[in-house]
Each structure stands twice: as structure tokens, then as C-alpha cells.
């Protein structure tokens, strides 16, 4: 069976060099350099060893081959007891909070304004470039929904200096590996972070591991509360029942619901997690152009999260 570490995105290629090494390559040299530098600098995160960075028309680096599964595969298929999975979530959240307690260098405060691109600016730019009319209104399960512009405007995510941290930057379940010798009593030695962002999200793409710690937690929420991995696995689907009307079918299991409740109990029931998730789903729609069904489901799911947010945090 192909090791699940080897799943790659369309802009990367991953090949097996030997039983202990894989090679990740891309035409995006800056991305390869940024990832490699993150691995070199961020020893606080357990990650595979990397070496042999090569920069050229096709840039690459070699990485220790971790035999195991992604957290996404474990979650989708419920491969470990739910109590153990919740313990893993606690470990990751504690890692994020521990990193936040490490003060970033004073000169890195300059990155704060650039990080704002992560949210409303990126969402608006991607959707308009893809051809969305942000003034269109939608229906979800027969419920009237405001326009995407109104939704985006209500999903404010502010960043101040206390939010700056040394982050992973793309902390989704598919970028977290659990090796085959997993021991819930010793998670640190069996959990590995891969595919960090390593650069600013705006057009400058300046290489840095500084980011908004809330974004890392929001990416976890995107998998747990937002059901991203279940959508990718075709376990949650939406039907388009009109030009801008959807029916969303959500049949999450008790296992998933326990993990959701545990996340909220640990990370807090905060509106900002919903705001980040909504931005993530909307901004990802153009990136899934190869699968219109996933695009419909992601849009419908963003509308679902908006309704949940309104019901949870509506001003009394």
C-alpha cells in the first residue's frame, strides 16, 4: 500500500528515493526554500529530518520517510479510539499555545499588516478573480443567506502584536503524520508536522515562520468543525437545487461529534474560529477547480458555518 505520507498536491511531486528517504520537488523554488528553512529553524515542532536542498528550475529537498498515516486518514476512517484522538488534539493545541508564549523578535512585528491578507483580502481577491459576483445571495436548505460580501464583511479577523507567533502556517490534518508505532502516552515521539507555509501569505511571499497563531487553530477547526477532510473524502455532499441554492447533507458520526465537542471545550467556543473557517472555505473554492462537486459542497458548507455562527453569537 502506498504510504499516505506520499499524497501530494498538484503543484508538488513526491517520489520515494529509498526506504528511508522521500524527495519533494516543485517549480516553486521559493516555496521549497521556505519549507526547508522552516524545518531548519523550527525545532520546537517535531518534524521529519530534511537535507539536500537543491534550487533550480525544479527545486527539491530530501526528507526522512515517516512510515505511518496522516491525521486526516486516521480521523476520516476513525482508526484509533476517539479518546486517543482527542488527546492528540490537546497535544497540538498545547503546542500552538506554547509557541505563542515565545515572543517573536521585535523586528518581526513588521509582518503584522502583511498577515491581514490571510483573511478578507485573500477571500475577496480569489472569489472575484474566479468570477463570483459577491453581491449574489444564496439559499441553504431553504434558508435565505446574505450575499458573500455581507458574509465576508461580518467575518473580521483582527491581528495585533500579541497574536504573532512562530507558526506552522498550514496546520490541516493532512499535514500532520502519525507513525506506525504510535503511543498515546508518548505523542511527541510519534507525531510529525510537514508542509509548513514558511512565508508570508501576501504577494511579497517573504520567507518567515512568523504568523497569526489564530490561523493555526483555525486550520484545525477547519478539519474538525468545518468537516474539510470529510468533504474531500466525499462523506459530506451538497446538491445544487437552483442557480444559487443548495441542500447540504451532513451525516457526521458520534466519533466526529465527540471530537468537535472536545475541540470547543479545549480551544473555546469563539466566533473567530468560525470567521477563519468561513474565509478558508470560500477562498479554497477556486483552488478545487478540478472538482465542481467539491466546490459546491465547500460553498454550501461555508454558508452552513455562517448560519451556525449567527445562531451561536447573535447579539442578545
Regions found by a protein language model. Give the residues of each.
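Phosphate/pyrophosphate-binding loops and the adjoining catalytic core of nucleotide-dependent enzymes
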Residues: 2-13, 17-18, 92-108, 228-236, ...
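ATP-binding glycine-rich loop module of kinase domains
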Residues: 3-41, 48, 56, 64-65, ...
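Extended charged low-complexity segments that act as oligomerization/scaffolding linkers
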Residues: 20, 33, 51-52, 58-67, ...
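Conserved kinase catalytic-core helix
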Residues: 42, 47, 72-160, 166-167, ...
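Hydrophobic transmembrane helix bundles of membrane-integrated enzymes that assemble
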Residues: 54, 76, 132-156, 176-177, ...
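Active-site acidic catalytic loop and adjacent metal/ATP-binding pocket
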Residues: 150-211
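Active-site activation/catalytic loop segments of kinase-like enzymes and analogous catalytic loops
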Residues: 191, 199-262, 278-293
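All-alpha amphipathic helical-bundle segments outside canonical DNA-binding/catalytic cores
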Residues: 268-277
Amino acid at each position: 500500500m502506498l504510504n499516505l505520507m506520499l499524497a501530494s498536491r498538484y503543484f508538488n511531486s513526491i517520489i520515494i528515493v529509498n526506504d528511508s528517504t522521500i524527495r519533494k520537488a516543485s517549480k516553486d523554488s521559493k516555496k521549497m526554500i521556505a519549507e526547508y528553512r522552516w524545518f531548519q529553524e523550527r525545532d520546537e515542532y517535531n518534524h521529519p529530518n530534511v537535507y539536500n536542498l537543491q534550487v533550480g528550475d525544479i527545486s527539491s529537498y530530501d526528507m526522512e520517510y515517516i512510515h505511518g498515516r496522516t491525521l486526516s486518514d486516521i480521523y476520516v476512517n476513525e482508526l484509533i479510539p476517539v479518546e486517543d484522538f482527542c488527546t492528540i488534539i490537546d497535544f497540538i493545541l498545547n503546542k500552538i499555545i506554547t509557541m505563542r508564549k515565545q515572543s517573536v523578535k521585535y523586528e518581526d512585528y513588521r509582518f503584522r499588516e502583511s498577515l491581514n491578507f490571510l483573511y478578507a483580502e485573500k477571500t475577496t481577491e480569489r472569489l472575484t478573480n474566479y468570477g463570483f459576483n459577491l453581491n449574489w445571495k444564496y439559499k441553504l436548505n431553504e434558508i435565505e443567506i446574505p450575499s458573500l460580501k455581507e458574509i465576508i464583511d461580518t467575518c473580521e479577523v483582527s491581528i495585533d502584536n500579541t497574536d504573532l507567533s512562530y507558526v506552522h502556517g498550514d496546520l490541516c490534518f493532512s499535514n500532520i503524520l502519525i507513525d506506525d508505532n504510535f503511543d498515546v502516552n508518548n505523542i511527541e515521539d510519534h507525531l510529525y508536522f510537514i508542509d509548513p507555509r514558511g512565508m508570508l501569505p501576501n504577494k511579497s511571499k517573504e520567507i518567515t515562520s512568523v504568523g497569526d497563531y489564530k490561523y493555526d487553530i483555525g486550520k484545525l477547526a477547519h478539519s474538525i468543525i468545518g468537516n474539510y477532510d470529510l468533504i474531500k473524502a466525499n462523506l459530506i455532499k451538497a446538491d445544487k437545487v437552483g442557480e444559487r441554492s443548495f441542500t447540504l447533507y451532513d451525516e457526521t458520526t458520534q466519533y466526529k461529534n465527540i471530537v468537535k465537542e472536545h475541540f470547543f471545550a479545549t480551544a473555546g467556543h469563539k466566533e473567530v474560529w468560525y470567521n477563519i473557517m468561513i474565509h478558508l472555505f470560500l477562498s479554497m473554492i477556486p483552488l478545487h477547480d478540478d472538482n465542481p462537486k467539491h466546490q459546491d459542497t465547500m460553498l454550501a458548507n461555508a454558508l452552513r458555518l455562517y448560519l451556525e455562527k449567527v445562531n451561536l453569537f447573535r447579539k442578545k
